[in-house]
Amino acid sequence: MAGKFELKTGASGKYHFNLKAGNGQIILTSETYDSHEGAKSGIESVRKNAPDDGNYERKTSSKGDPYFVLKAGNGQTIGKSEMYSSESAMENGIESVKTNAPDAAIAETAG
């Protein structure tokens, strides 16, 4: 099953999206956007930048949990991962984003 972007409108009228793997797990969460167009542009940026390993910044939370940030070519953050239990799990998450993002469909939902 292919991955998909879920584009959501929040109660505040702002937009964000999640990239879900084929198994339904969220593998990337976007920043918040003021407009629908901005969020769709963010999705296109994820599609464009996801295949390049150099666009991933690997980090560790204050609690020691690994996670990653996907950045656009201009250095702007376009998505963050969940917290992982290990670095190998985080690397698997990065590979999943690389695999799923370029061809993922967009599904729009409220909430």
Language model segments and positions:
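Mixed-charge, glycine-accented linear interaction segment located at domain edges/termini
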Residues: 83, 95-96, 102-109
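Short glycine-rich, low-complexity/disordered patches
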Residues: 50-62, 103-111
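A structural feature that tracks compact, well-ordered secondary-structure segments
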Residues: 6-8, 14-22, 27-33, 42-46, ...
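Acidic, aromatic-enriched beta-alpha/helix-loop junctions
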Residues: 36, 40, 50-51
